[in-house]
Amino acid sequence: MRSCHRWLLFALCLNALGAGRARAGERLTLNFNPDWKFIRADPAGAAAPDFDDRAWQTISAPHTFNDTDTFDDWSTPGHVGEMNQWSGRTWYRKAFTLPPGTAGKKVFIEFEAVRQVAEVYLNGHLLGVSRNGFIPFGFDLTTLLRFDGRKNVIAVMCDNSFEHETDMHKLTATALPWNSPHWHPAHGGIYRNVLLHLTDPLHISLPLFSFLQTTGPYVYATDLSDQSARVHLEVPVENGRDRDAAVALQAEIVDAGGHTVLTLQADLPVAAGSRSQFNVEGELTAPRWWEPDQPYVYRVRCMLRVNGETVDTAEVPLGLRTAKWTVDQGLFLNGRHVKLHGWGQKPTDEWPGLGAAQPDWLHYYTLNLMREAGGNFVRWGHCAGGPAMIAAGDRLGIITEQPGVDGEGDAQGDAWTIRAAAWRDMIIYYRNHPSILIWEGGNQKVSREHAAELRALMDRYDPHGGRAYAHRRADEVTAEFMDVGIGTEGGREIARLPVVEGEYDREESPRRVWDDYSPPHFGYPEARGQTYQLTSEQFAVNEVGQYVGKLGRAAHSGGANWIFSDTTSGGRVSVEVARAGGEVDGARLPKEAYYVCRAMFRADPQVHLIGHWTYPAGTRKTVHVASNGDDVELFVNGRSLGHGRRSDRFLFTFADVAWEPGEIRAVASLAGKIVATETKRTAGAPVALRLTASTGPGGLRADGSDVALIDVEAVDAHGERCPTFQQRVDFACTGPATWRGGYNSGEIKSINHLHLDLECGINRVSVRAGRTAGAITVQARCAGLADGSITIESHAFPAENGMATVLPAMPEVSLPAQRPAPAPDFLASVVAPASVPKAGGRFTTAFSYSGPARGVRVESDALDARRIFADRDGYFDGLPEALQGADHVLTANADARYNAVDLMEIAVRAGAIVSVAHDDRLQRPTWLTRQFQPTRQALTIDHRHRMTIFTRQAERDESLTLGANTEDAATKDALMYLVFVNGAPAAP
């Protein structure tokens, strides 16, 4: 009786908050995130129902046990990632009773993802083991549940162990290549949402294939036009009742305003204990398109009725769009040409102090930053984005490239079995989301058998979704099954396929370093000798040339800059704690490059002055401005400095500008009319700290996992941020929250302390809500400045037995009343340099290069007296006879220390001899010794530098991936390797 009374109070409380409950006979989906018990250990017997977990920590999902040991170690050059993270077996447990009246229901649990291996137990019984780490999965709990008021115990053993082998090609046969900090930081835990679904035994199946073998509803449209669309709906039904049933389906297509615009109905007899499927269709008049400027999403509400009584409901999204990919013009969406511009992003989406475990609204926050900058495309790399990320893409109009699970390359044995199953499960789960236009089969090529398997799964489970199948770094074998190719650094491996960019502009720069003239750093001195050493200003300027030069061609569909936010995976600079290639840092504070992208990507008038206007006396510097106008005039204190020199369409440069206190203003014009201005002012002396908070919709929830972000700025007497201020700030946090802090980009072990340096006058910290509502106060102190303080109210979050009817929250999006006019194509008039070098030789069938140097290309007929490098003087002398007449890759010696695991992709015919000459002063990179055999022959360059020749013969038509010249970041002097391709020797 007491349990029933508590549930009644719980339900009344939720109704008072407007959360509501499912109506009688309808499906009830419960938030199963709150109030788990957790231990970072592996005690014996932890799966047993009566195990004593009272001493364990109480947490709420999303949760990771690596939230405070990330962004805290120096990056290891060579794309290794953050290997120094705690890993091992951990346990989560939850004791719960079911709500009254649920006896006779089916009960399913859904995990949106657990990293990496999850053993799930109910009342001591093993339900199954999930190993892929990124794809939703679930179980039918019904037969093992106690419905009589006794406690049920669900236990999850979570193991994030990974192999610390830094050479991905030496992983053991049982290792999962994507479970490595190389590609994804190993943030273990129940790091996404957990849901409990209560249904009638006669119900619509869930889109959770592994362990349930079910697919859920599938909706798509054909014959789309501005006047009408034919909507098709497949609704799979399971009858778990003990008698046959005459089932009626009513499906309502509901528009964004909540109005039913189409109703589909059908009747179907379903035998007891069997499965069946409704197939219905109807014509929707005056449809609204889903597209980046108008991401209109309908809801398809499916209701099952027996004898007039509703027994189950399910809802899926529907977006109406057509996609046509062309080789010579790129993408046409709904008949309009669309140039893709956006970013790649890791599916861990990690933050310092939070790791991969974030509330849904924070994933939306990151994607909304992309959209605010004009982004219309995201490539999740190299595992699937989660449910909140994909749903945010639907709402924001961000075209999505969605992979399964991958690192880089093919997989074998158990790893492939897991990868293929995850691919299938991913397609089934996400196939109704309109934002997904590309299913990515892999980050590199795979075997013919594997490509055929993945393509067949796509064709089986998403035959009508209008999506393309693609791989990055494909060869002709993989391309046989592809619809589009995924390029790298503007490359295009498969000339006959449309190309979408997967990774361009893989440079790095930390946010804290302004330029060569700004205190306290005056450049980036700590990075001298590193491969990547750009200041924020240089990084922003580089952004323009990279975008225009690599994606500017009309035949290129556009695509993804790599990467959006600084990440701990794939780091390459030993003086940074992250791979600093993002347009925003790890805490999502924008760099100058972010605003440059906004000036290039957005359709409305934009202008951005790169940098600030608070310099030491006597400073003279070049000022750069980015704008989508066609002219920019610069003013200092009202005095015109003339019009900028325009380059790469969007960049305007003003040389030798003398700094003086006051203001600098950029005025952008288009066709002679002023369209945008930006002004920056000299900041005065810092006098105070200012704190500003950001929370999710409805404010901070006291659910144990919600987060509040707090920006901390040093400001002058006028409230202007002081852009060169860098100094320690000490914090105090009181109230029902856990301090999670932030990080400093160039400092190890800065995570989760109650102190932090401001960088460029600002930093960002976070607090995680507890389970008690109340006032949370954060105070900040800094020597010489007035203190700052802010109070955030956390709101009560009712939950009972670890369950709530209030589901994770995400902001709503406003839609335009009418379809907007097509966005202007600012790149249309750009004549970009060819970024896809032609093969150019007799024996080389395709070639692409991802390094920063230009001019790298294939030339035919290597001979003495021919040029060796594209960027320096020097000519072959004494070329071995076996290499004479070969195709020769004219490499750039400037890239001798550039680090990329896929620097070159070169395709050759069967029988071709591929030779690589490598400087003897260097250690041999793994890719070289793995793919090639050393010979006794050598080249001597500059009469003193010996380069040993390695060779291999192609047994079939194949594409080879060649990596960096060296894996040793300390290397100072060495020549870039040389590549030759010759025909097979004549038969004797």
Model regions and ranges:
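Short flexible loop/turn segments that cap and initiate beta-strands
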Residues: 49-52, 245-250, 292-299, 620, ...
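Active-site-adjacent substrate/metal-binding segments within catalytic domains
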Residues: 66-98, 102-111, 115-123, 128-131, ...
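Short S/T/G/P-enriched beta-strand
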Residues: 602-622, 681-709, 713-722, 787-829
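Extended acidic/polar, glycine-enriched regions
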Residues: 146-151, 234-326, 654-662, 670, ...
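Non-catalytic, glycine-rich low-complexity segments
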Residues: 26-43, 55-99, 110-112, 159-243, ...
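Accessory beta-strand-rich segments of carbohydrate-active enzymes
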Residues: 30, 42, 87-213, 240, ...
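Beta-strand-rich structural segments
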Residues: 233-237, 303, 623-626, 667, ...
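Substrate-binding/catalytic cleft of secreted carbohydrate-active enzymes
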Residues: 308, 361-370, 376-589, 593, ...
